[in-house]
Structures are given as C-alpha cells and as structure tokens.
C-alpha cells in the first residue's frame, strides 16, 4: 500500500508538470502568433470558471480595447476637471459682488438726480410762455443738453421717454435762438415790450432768479472776457442781450454798434459750440 501511494504521487506530479508546460501563457501567445489556439480563462455571472478556445488576435484585441476604453475615460475626467475650474465662482461684475455695490449705488443716484432735473425742466418748458420765463431766469440750451445726456448716459437701458427728451431739447433750442433774428435787421429790433410785460408778471422767486442771472452776466461781460471764456462759463446769450437792452444799447444803435456786433459774434460762437457737442 505504501509503494502504491508513492507511485500514485509520482504519477500525479509528473502529469501535472506535463500539463503545466504544455499550456501556453498569454505572453507566449503574443510572442508566438503561430500558436493555433489556447484556453483562455473566463468566469460567468455565477462565478464559475469557464474555458474558451481563443487565439492571440482576440487577446491583442481585448488588450487594445481595454486601452482604448481607458484613455477616453481619463480624458473625459480631465476635461471635466478643467471645465469646473473654468466656471467663475464670483464674477467681478456680478450684482452679488460687494465690491460693485458703491459704484452701482452712485450710478442709481446720478440717474435719479438726472431724472429729477428733467422733471423740473419739463415744468419749465411746458409752453412758449414758460420757456420765455426760463430764458429770462438764465436757462441755457447747454443746461438742458447736459441733463439730456445725463439721463441717456446713466440709464441702464434706453429710457422710454427718449423721444420726448429729444423733442423738449430741440424745441427749446429752436425757440431760444429764434429770439435773435431781429438783430440782423437795420436797425436791430428787440421786443422790449414783450419782455417787460413778462417781467411784471413774474413771482418773487422768478424775479430773484432773473436778477441773479443779469448780475452774473454783467460781471462776466464787464471783465472783458473772450467768447471762449464766456462759453466756458455758459453765459446765456439771451440774458446778455437783455443786459444790453437794460443799459439802453438798442436805443442808441449808432453809438453802440461795436457792442451789438460783439453780442452777435458771441451768439454765433455759442451756437457753433453747441452744435459741435451734439
């Protein structure tokens, strides 16, 4: 019995060694593509071991398929990481950024202030008589233009009353410069009665504004400033003409031609400057 057991053990060892050396490995299949087939180990869903006859081409295809499947997945992961980094968490221009709040508040305040001024100017330019009162109080086209530009500039979008703003401005400018047509006649004509009667109808507040405008223009004219300097100070050509009328220039045209010519030159320069800045 002992001899039989030894012989059986030797037989089992020798048979196992032969089977082991006769079965080609995966590496040997790649190095020796002439091998016809091999047993490729596989497992089913239940965990049972299966044997499948396959060749080296299938093995290479499986390895290539694994590499082709892994690389795109890795690239997709990298792209996903890059895209996440590219998404801005807090933009500098975002409304939620506290750094932009002071600028936005200042922008809103300027817009409200400009609209308030426009409301006041609309009240001052309702009709021709109201425009005349505003002109006597020193309101110039440049004042109205600055308010118009402020509203258009500080609005986050085009204001719905843009056409109305432009219409108010154009009508005021046309009426304003229409008052100087009589200066080109010989002798120059100035409607003194119209403005004197309007002056009598003014309230105390309007009378104060009228006197202040005349005093301001009088100081600048008496300094002998040039047209460019007067324009920079926004001296009203209409108040300038009213000042000359108050001083009796139009009653003695022959002796005051130089003053009237200076007024006409200033009106021309003022209008050209206004049109250039449109």
Swiss-Prot record:
Transmembrane segments: none annotated. The keyword Membrane applies. A motif (RxLR-dEER) lies at residues 49-64. Residues 1-18 form the signal peptide. It is found in: Secreted; Host endoplasmic reticulum membrane. Keywords: Host endoplasmic reticulum, Host membrane, Membrane, Secreted, Signal, Virulence. GO terms for cellular component: extracellular region; host cell endoplasmic reticulum membrane; membrane. It comes from the Eukaryota. Belongs to the RxLR effector family. Secreted effector that completely suppresses the host cell death induced by cell death-inducing proteins. The RxLR-dEER motif acts to carry the protein into the host cell cytoplasm through binding to cell surface phosphatidylinositol-3-phosphate. This is Secreted RxLR effector protein 151.
């Amino acid at each position: 019995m002992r001899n039989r057991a030894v012989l059986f053990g030797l037989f089992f060892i020798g048979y196992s060694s032969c089977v082991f050396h006769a079965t080609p490995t995966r590496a040997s299949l790649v190095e020796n593509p002439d091998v016809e087939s091999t047993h490729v180990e596989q497992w089913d869903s239940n965990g049972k071991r299966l044997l499948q006859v396959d060749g080296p081409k299938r093995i290479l295809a499986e390895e290539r398929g694994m590499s082709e499947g892994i690389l795109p997945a890795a690239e997709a992961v990298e792209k996903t990481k890059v895209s996440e980094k590219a998404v801005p968490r807090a933009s500098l221009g975002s409304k939620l950024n506290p750094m932009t709040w002071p600028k936005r508040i200042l922008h809103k305040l300027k817009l409200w202030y400009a609209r308030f001024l426009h409301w006041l100017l609309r009240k001052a330019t309702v009709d021709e008589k109201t425009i005349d009162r505003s002109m006597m109080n020193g309101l110039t086209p440049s004042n109205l233009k600055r308010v118009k530009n402020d509203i258009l500039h500080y609005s986050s979008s085009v204001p719905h009353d843009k056409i109305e703003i432009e219409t108010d401005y154009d009508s005021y400018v046309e009426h304003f410069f229409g008052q100087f047509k009589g200066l080109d006649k010989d002798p120059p004509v100035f409607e003194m009665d119209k403005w004197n009667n309007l002056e009598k109808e003014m309230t105390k507040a309007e009378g104060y504004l009228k006197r202040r405008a005349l005093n301001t223009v009088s100081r600048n004219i008496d300094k002998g400033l040039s047209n460019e300097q007067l324009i920079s100070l926004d001296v009203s050509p209409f108040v300038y003409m009213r000042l000359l009328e108050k001083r009796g220039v139009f009653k003695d045209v022959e002796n005051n031609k130089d003053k009237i010519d200076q007024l006409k030159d200033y009106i021309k320069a003022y209008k050209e400057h206004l049109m250039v800045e449109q």
